[in-house]
Amino acid sequence: IKVKEALYNQILESKGDKVNVETSDATYLGLPIAEAAKFFTPDEKNFDFEKLDADYLNKADSDELQILLNSAFSREEVDAIQDICRNWRSVNKRFAGEMISAIDLSRPKSQHIDIMLHYMQPNEVKELYERTDSEMQGLMHHAANASRVKDDFRTSLDTLTHCLSGDDVEEIMLTKDIRGNIPATITDEAAIIAMDYFKENPELVAKMLVNREDFGAGILFDTSEIKVLEKAFEVLKNNPDELADILMLCNANGDTAYTYHKEMGHSKEIKNALEEKITELAVDSDLSVKESISLLEINELHPQIANYLRYQK
């Protein structure tokens, strides 16, 4: 179904809350605006955004704004967002608050956000990133989604770190959704990108790796990709204490990442990599003897080495 461009003009000109919609197949009389908007197709430029006036934007109710904004965000071109922000802000300095509350957080891409930020105050930028949807997911969770992570996540990280303070960035990156996932645990690829991006901040990477302790798991439990382990070990190579803590983290069943992967048998490669790293930390790192023994015992590895270390105390 294709909608004629006249529909948008009808919406603007309508004095009530109902419009007539004429499609190639039929004519629909007296449809509520929300219903009329359903005839819009994402790949069609049915809205003439350049003709949007600030008066309309400030009179529209929240449902109309949501339809308008999300229709714009669903498109590849960014001109629509530019026009909405410029026209709206011209008479309403608090337009960002309305926009933040109206948008579907799964829609905006990094290029959309870049444009919006030019029209926002710092506190509004923080509010934008802190907002979550019904699944408790924010913009960074959605940017890490499997369908977008390759093209959007790293760019979104650039924008996030450019606009917010270090403490605010950490808060956003450690925000959990309803399932306990932070942005870096949405996909294996997101985990690799996030750890590489923050490699100069190993303390934050360590926090991301243990972020689900209250849910009984973490990135190293969930992953099926050896590259996730390799990146974690690389970033934390000079932080043996933090890495040991991560490798001693237990889920609700009392399993560490190593014993979990050993029991599940999903990946022998991951199990072997974990065993190798645990052993290396225990015998060839700056861990104390007590920490080394605890690391081996909780992972049920090499009791003979643990006994040897015990006699060295």
PLM regions: where:
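Non-Sec secretion/translocation targeting segments of pathogen effectors
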Residues: 1-3, 13, 293, 298, ...
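Ankyrin repeat structural motif
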Residues: 4, 43, 78-84, 109-120, ...
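Charged, low-complexity interaction regions
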Residues: 17-19, 287
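Ankyrin repeat arrays, specifically the small/polar loop and inter-repeat linker segments at the C-terminal end
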Residues: 19, 56-57, 88-96, 122-132, ...
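Ankyrin-repeat boundary/"N-cap" motif
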Residues: 25-27, 63-69, 94-104, 131-144, ...
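Amphipathic alpha-helical elements of HEAT/ARM-like alpha-solenoid repeat scaffolds that form extended
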Residues: 29, 33, 112-116, 183, ...
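Ankyrin repeat A-helix N-terminal signature
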Residues: 71-72, 102-109, 142-148, 185-189, ...
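Leucine-rich solenoid repeat scaffolds
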Residues: 254-275, 285, 293-298
